[in-house]
């Protein structure tokens, strides 16, 4: 299927502009939080900046989807109850949305505008779908990587379209991600990346803060590498130890054949679905997210967009048994953990996971 003939052109345009607008808002908010923290006026327990960012991002994107595809459902992370109980937060959020709509006024004809709090509440609550294996719905994570967002580090705005339980389109805005990631310390190139994938078409990279929605033909096609030798491989993992079992992941790398003297340099720690973007663009080879406990179930919005990005760039994604992730199970995945790798080593990675988890 070519760049210009795929059946999701309108969906991709709407998703791209909505994610760009939400990414710009969350980037500005994250930067201001970091500055406030440096001045000592932000307390550790103050969750309001994240709350505002989450709600504003979800409102912008949900509004754009419902404006263009009124029959589509949305599985979103937030509902508006907390916001309606705190009019101060709601006022701050509406000010941010109004500001960003003016700064991206060229997008208004396609993604629309929000003008009052009730409209914002309604848009947020469009995200109440339970998902499922039939029909068409979107999965949204308005700010993926909360800790990274607060640190001024990596976070992402993630949107995916799911049809009959299968992801067919994904868009991930990465406001703080450099184009080139060599190690935890070495980042270079343009900061701010937009990663998109369409089923049967491919995965693509473009500059996040470049105005408008570039057609795929003008974007950079990205592909995973086919490295197989452990000395060549790089692994992406989360930063927060509460989200995945780093100790188990260390054992898996050893079992796979990583050299203990170099494995630390071969591991890149990143918050959010930017890990999928680094993998899909060929800058890493394995993504490990082992469950911290056996009862935890991943949310679909944490993986849907990244899932199609990996497949369309030539990789493979599964749970700890290697089975494909099931996005038709409702709001959560019915499996444990997430593993992604290039197709040449995926089965070997799963073998190592199985050995360690015995």
Swiss-Prot record:
<comment type="similarity">
    <text>Belongs to the inositol monophosphatase superfamily.</text>
</comment>
<feature type="binding site">
    <location>
        <position position="275"/>
    </location>
    <ligand>
        <name>adenosine 3',5'-bisphosphate</name>
    </ligand>
</feature>
<keyword id="KW-0028">Amino-acid biosynthesis</keyword>
<feature type="binding site">
    <location>
        <position position="77"/>
    </location>
    <ligand>
        <name>Mg(2+) 1</name>
    </ligand>
</feature>
<dbReference type="InterPro" id="IPR000760">
    <property type="entry name" value="Inositol_monophosphatase-like"/>
</dbReference>
<feature type="binding site">
    <location>
        <position position="146"/>
    </location>
    <ligand>
        <name>adenosine 3',5'-bisphosphate</name>
    </ligand>
</feature>
<feature type="active site" description="Proton acceptor">
    <location>
        <position position="146"/>
    </location>
</feature>
<comment type="function">
    <text>Phosphatase that converts adenosine 3'-phosphate 5'-phosphosulfate (PAPS) to adenosine 5'-phosphosulfate (APS) and 3'(2')-phosphoadenosine 5'-phosphate (PAP) to AMP. Regulates the flux of sulfur in the sulfur-activation pathway by converting PAPS to APS. Involved in salt tolerance.</text>
</comment>
<feature type="binding site">
    <location>
        <position position="243"/>
    </location>
    <ligand>
        <name>AMP</name>
    </ligand>
</feature>
<feature type="active site" description="Proton acceptor">
    <location>
        <position position="54"/>
    </location>
</feature>
<dbReference type="Pfam" id="PF00459">
    <property type="entry name" value="Inositol_P"/>
</dbReference>
<keyword id="KW-0378">Hydrolase</keyword>
<feature type="binding site">
    <location>
        <position position="275"/>
    </location>
    <ligand>
        <name>AMP</name>
    </ligand>
</feature>
<dbReference type="InterPro" id="IPR006239">
    <property type="entry name" value="DPNP"/>
</dbReference>
<feature type="binding site">
    <location>
        <position position="141"/>
    </location>
    <ligand>
        <name>Mg(2+) 1</name>
    </ligand>
</feature>
<feature type="binding site">
    <location>
        <position position="302"/>
    </location>
    <ligand>
        <name>adenosine 3',5'-bisphosphate</name>
    </ligand>
</feature>
<feature type="binding site">
    <location>
        <position position="243"/>
    </location>
    <ligand>
        <name>adenosine 3',5'-bisphosphate</name>
    </ligand>
</feature>
<feature type="binding site">
    <location>
        <position position="289"/>
    </location>
    <ligand>
        <name>adenosine 3',5'-bisphosphate</name>
    </ligand>
</feature>
<dbReference type="GO" id="GO:0008652">
    <property type="term" value="P:amino acid biosynthetic process"/>
</dbReference>
<feature type="binding site">
    <location>
        <position position="272"/>
    </location>
    <ligand>
        <name>adenosine 3',5'-bisphosphate</name>
    </ligand>
</feature>
<dbReference type="GO" id="GO:0008441">
    <property type="term" value="F:3'(2'),5'-bisphosphate nucleotidase activity"/>
</dbReference>
<feature type="binding site">
    <location>
        <position position="272"/>
    </location>
    <ligand>
        <name>AMP</name>
    </ligand>
</feature>
<feature type="binding site">
    <location>
        <position position="302"/>
    </location>
    <ligand>
        <name>Mg(2+) 2</name>
    </ligand>
</feature>
<protein>
    <recommendedName>
        <fullName>3'(2'),5'-bisphosphate nucleotidase 2</fullName>
        <ecNumber>3.1.3.7</ecNumber>
    </recommendedName>
</protein>
<feature type="binding site">
    <location>
        <position position="141"/>
    </location>
    <ligand>
        <name>Mg(2+) 2</name>
    </ligand>
</feature>
<feature type="binding site">
    <location>
        <position position="144"/>
    </location>
    <ligand>
        <name>Mg(2+) 2</name>
    </ligand>
</feature>
<dbReference type="GO" id="GO:0046872">
    <property type="term" value="F:metal ion binding"/>
</dbReference>
<feature type="binding site">
    <location>
        <position position="302"/>
    </location>
    <ligand>
        <name>AMP</name>
    </ligand>
</feature>
<dbReference type="InterPro" id="IPR020583">
    <property type="entry name" value="Inositol_monoP_metal-BS"/>
</dbReference>
<feature type="binding site">
    <location>
        <position position="143"/>
    </location>
    <ligand>
        <name>Mg(2+) 1</name>
    </ligand>
</feature>
<feature type="binding site">
    <location>
        <position position="77"/>
    </location>
    <ligand>
        <name>Mg(2+) 3</name>
    </ligand>
</feature>
<keyword id="KW-0547">Nucleotide-binding</keyword>
<dbReference type="GO" id="GO:0000103">
    <property type="term" value="P:sulfate assimilation"/>
</dbReference>
<dbReference type="GO" id="GO:0000166">
    <property type="term" value="F:nucleotide binding"/>
</dbReference>
<keyword id="KW-0460">Magnesium</keyword>
<dbReference type="GO" id="GO:0046854">
    <property type="term" value="P:phosphatidylinositol phosphate biosynthetic process"/>
</dbReference>
<dbReference type="InterPro" id="IPR020550">
    <property type="entry name" value="Inositol_monophosphatase_CS"/>
</dbReference>
<dbReference type="InterPro" id="IPR051090">
    <property type="entry name" value="Inositol_monoP_superfamily"/>
</dbReference>
<keyword id="KW-0479">Metal-binding</keyword>
<feature type="binding site">
    <location>
        <position position="289"/>
    </location>
    <ligand>
        <name>AMP</name>
    </ligand>
</feature>
């Amino acid at each position: 299927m070519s760049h210009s003939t795929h059946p999701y052109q309108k969906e991709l345009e709407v998703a791209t502009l909505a994610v760009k607008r939400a990414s710009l808002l969350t980037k500005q908010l994250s930067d201001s939080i970091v500055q406030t923290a440096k001045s000592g006026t932000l307390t550790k327990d103050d969750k309001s900046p994240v709350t505002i960012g989450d709600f504003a991002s979800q409102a912008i994107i949900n509004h754009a989807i419902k404006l263009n595809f009124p029959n589509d459902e949305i599985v979103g992370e937030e509902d508006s109850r907390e916001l309606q109980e705190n009019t101060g937060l709601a006022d701050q959020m509406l000010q941010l949305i109004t500001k960003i709509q003016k700064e991206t006024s060229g997008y208004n004809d396609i993604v629309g505008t929000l003008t009052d709090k009730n409209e914002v509440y309604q848009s947020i609550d469009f995200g109440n779908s339970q998902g499922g294996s039939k029909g068409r719905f979107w999965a949204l994570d308005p700010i993926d990587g909360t800790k990274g967002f607060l640190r001024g580090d990596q976070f992402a705005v993630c949107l995916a379209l799911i049809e009959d339980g299968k992801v067919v389109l994904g868009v991930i805005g990465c406001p703080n991600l450099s184009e080139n990631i060599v190690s935890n310390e070495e980042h270079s190139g343009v900061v701010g990346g937009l990663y998109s994938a369409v089923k049967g078409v491919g995965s693509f990279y473009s500059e996040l803060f470049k105005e408008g929605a570039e057609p795929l033909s003008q974007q950079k096609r990205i592909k995973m590498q086919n490295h197989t030798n452990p000395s060549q491989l790089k692994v992406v993992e989360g930063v927060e130890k509460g989200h995945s079992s780093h100790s188990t992941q260390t054992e898996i790398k050893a079992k796979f054949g990583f050299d203990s003297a170099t494995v630390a340099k071969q591991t890149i720690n990143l918050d959010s679905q930017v890990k999928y973007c680094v993998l899909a663009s060929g800058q890493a080879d394995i993504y490990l997210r082992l469950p911290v406990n056996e009862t935890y179930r991943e949310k679909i919005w944490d993986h849907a967009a990244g899932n199609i990005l990996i497949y369309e760039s030539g990789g493979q994604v599964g749970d700890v048994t290697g089975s494909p992730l099931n996005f038709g199970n409702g709001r959560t995945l019915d499996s444990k953990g997430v593993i992604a790798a290039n197709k040449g080593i995926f089965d070997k990675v799963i073998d190592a996971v199985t050995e360690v988890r015995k």
